[in-house]
A protein has these predicted regions:
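Substrate-binding cleft of carbohydrate-active enzyme catalytic domains
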Residues: 1-101
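Catalytic-core regions of glycoside hydrolase
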Residues: 6-9, 60-63, 72-234
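Conserved residues at the C-terminal ends of beta-strands
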Residues: 68-70, 202, 454
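C-terminal functional modules
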Residues: 228-398
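Disordered, acidic Ser/Thr/Pro-rich linker "stalks" and the adjacent N-terminal cap
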Residues: 390-448, 454-468, 477, 485-491
């Protein structure tokens, strides 16, 4: 038998029983899910093994079950076989027991990104043949996406029932170096039970730190029409860390964005600027914010009574405090730079405020402030070095800057295009569309003799490369001239 069909060891079975009892005490429905996986045969032995496992779980106290057919290939993706299995389980197990909730299924086509939209697609087959009581998961237009009437209309018209929305937030399995503490938004507030039968939030691996987002999702589901993301977030901060709320808020407001994929707003109360656009009032306000950032970790450590939450946040808080320090120093350094009276003093302080390789490795492992704070530091240091070297030498230094139509091309991720390290790379985090572009700003008009683009992986299944692309150049950033014909599937 596959391992998934075997009984749990005694200790694990006891843990599940304990968890189920805790759920009952707290009015939470415990749902046990199984993923049949690649080894499914669709034969009678398979079916009886599954029923036996369901009965074992029933005896442990499980009264709600789900089957997942996501992220597999081969025979297991057959929607006709899936519906036959689900319908038979509903008849033989769910209805015969009498006290078991309706089944839930995650289809192979759980996102519009790759779902077959035709009447022959698996979703349409679900709609025509799947027992009406069975609830069907849906992640939206892409894997991580907002809950909108449009995406529900699209899927509901095919599965012929209100979808069960699987919201991939605040999960960070695609950005494990980030911990999401921002407001819960992107959930439409005009929906009702005719549009969806439920919503499930996929949390981070950090259980305690996920509670801020789960507090928002719970609030949304309790009263959809009245839900307000910011009001909920402000209340959640106080609920989770009442004795250090303001310091926690400082950390949370700068720990919202993913940098890639499912982008979230961050640092919306903070205004940053380039050194060339210096404004003393804005500089003082930004220094005060960096000062709060620098002090927040110690204040949180002092006031946080949830040891589990503190343990999860600590690696990020350590780097957050360092970000506050280097941000303050960058602003202080900018005053010396703008004064222009002591080159030696400026350069000594500049060198001391550079991030070492170890500093960067530590920050990359536990990032925050990615949308505004760290980019301010990076841009300020780059701008001052560029201006200083130009003034000293009288020549324009070589300076490459990543640009593009993708939103995160404006973040420090774009620097990874030109760091001379083949183990690091820039990724947009989203699929390319017609008209998307990525490029390099050379800083000034220069002769270019070679363009080298390293992309893709050593895999036949890889799709991370430009497709139907053209290499172009521009002198003014407005008029573009092709350098090549269209390039198709060239990994290079």
């Amino acid at each position: 038998k596959p391992l998934s069909m075997l009984p749990y060891p005694e200790k694990e079975a006891g843990n599940i029983k304990e968890l189920i009892e805790a759920c009952k005490r707290n009015r939470v429905d415990f749902v046990w899910a199984i993923h049949p996986g690649q080894d499914i045969k669709w034969n009678e032995e398979d079916y009886q093994n599954l029923v036996n496992k369901f009965n074992l779980m029933y005896d442990l106290g499980v009264r709600a079950f789900a089957l997942f057919f996501d992220d597999i290939s081969g025979e297991g993706t057959n929607p006709v076989k899936q519906t036959e299995l689900l319908n038979r389980l509903t008849k033989d197990f769910v209805k015969s027991k009498g006290d078991v909730a309706y089944l839930t299924v995650c289809p192979t086509d759980y996102s519009k990104l790759w779902a077959n939209p035709t009447p022959q697609g698996s979703l349409a087959i679900y709609g025509e043949t799947l027992d009406p009581s069975i609830e069907v998961f849906w992640t939206g237009d892409v894997v991580c996406s907002d809950l909108t009437p449009e995406t529900l209309d699209w899927v509901n018209s095919r599965i012929k029932r209100p979808a069960y929305f699987w919201w991939n937030y605040p999960v960070t399995d695609y950005v494990r170096n980030i911990i999401l503490q921002g407001p819960v938004y992107g959930l439409n507030t005009s929906l009702d039970s005719n549009d969806l039968c439920g919503i499930a939030s996929n949390p981070m691996e950090h259980g305690e730190a996920s509670k801020l987002a789960l507090y928002g999702v719970a609030d949304y589901t309790w009263n959809i029409a009245a839900y307000n993301p910011i009001d909920n977030w402000e209340r959640g901060l106080g609920e989770l860390m009442p004795k250090a709320r303001e310091a926690y808020r400082t950390f949370a407001i700068h720990s919202c964005d993913t940098e890639t994929g499912y982008r979230r707003d961050e640092s919306w109360e903070t205004k940053t600027f380039r050194i060339g656009d210096w404004n003393e009032t804005e500089a003082q306000a930004l220094w005060a914010e960096f000062d709060k950032v620098e002090k927040a970790p110690a204040e949180i450590e002092k006031g946080c009574t949830n040891k589990g939450l503190m343990s999860e946040l600590t690696p990020w808080l350590q780097e957050f405090g360092k970000l506050g320090t280097r941000g303050k120093r960058a602003l202080e350094l900018a005053r010396v730079y703008r004064d222009g009276k002591d080159d030696a003093d400026f350069w000594n302080k500049y060198i001391r405020n550079l991030m070492s390789k170890k500093d960067r490795e530590d920050y990359e492992a536990h990032k925050s402030g990615t949308m505004k704070l760290q980019p301010f530091y990076e841009n300020a240091m780059d701008d001052m070095a560029y201006g200083f070297l130009t003034r000293l030498s009288g020549e324009t230094p070589i300076c490459y800057r990543g640009i593009g139509s993708f939103h995160n091309a404006k973040t420090t991720l774009s620097k990874l295009m030109f760091d001379h390290d083949t183990t690091t790379y820039y990724t947009s985090g989203i699929a390319q569309k017609a008209g998307d572009w990525i490029g390099v700003d050379l800083g000034s008009v220069k002769d270019v003799t070679e363009v080298s683009i390293l992309q893709g992986r050593n895999s036949v299944d890889d799709v991370d490369y430009f497709d139907h692309a053209v290499v172009e150049y521009s002198i003014d950033g407005k008029a573009w001239t092709p350098l090549t014909e269209e390039l198709n599937k060239q990994i290079g």
